Amino acid sequence: IVQDMALRRMNLPVELHASTQAATRTPEQALFLERCGFARVILERALSLDEIRTIRAACGVDLECFVHGAICVGYSGRCFLSRSMSERSGNRGACSQPCRLTYDLVDESGRTVVKGRHLLSVRDLNLSDRIGELIDAGITSFKIEGRLKDIGYIKNVVSYYRQRIDRALASRPGFCRSSVGELSLIHISEPT
């Protein structure tokens, strides 16, 4: 999974997937990446179903989209907040997620208007009820954010989505799972 287009010149012996950091949100961008030899494009998080359908109609590359996790306040690959507040760059896959912290909103006179609220990331992405629509729009792979999450959280969220995807595929002849294996839905507590 790459953002840096120079890597394609290295003729790596692996299938190239364009990272969400490439901020692909138009048919032209997806078609360009396909012509550059990318097998899969991970789409920008904030696309509508109509935008996804338009991209699907323009190219044949596999399309992947985020279905669960943080809703980024900026375009993926275009955020500099993490790097400016810490030594970790979100554009290099090491986001410290400062947008998920609480902040105070202060007006121009210095008066606090809002105190200690989640002003930049007000909710999380959860498209579990839209899996069928995403499949119908042309999505071939789903992405669940797991960075900075514990193993129990990841296992439970992935198991839940596995059930939702299987249910959606059962009503769509011609579609099937591309992976094998089973995950069980079990809560795992992390020791403190």
Residue positions per predicted region:
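Catalytic alpha/beta core domains of metabolic enzymes, predominantly
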Residues: 8, 15-140, 148, 154-157, ...
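Residue-level detector of conserved catalytic or cofactor/ligand-binding positions
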Residues: 184-192
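N-terminal cofactor/phosphate-binding cores enriched in small/glycine residues
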Residues: 2-10
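Terminal amphipathic helices with adjacent charged low-complexity linkers/tails
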Residues: 152, 156-184
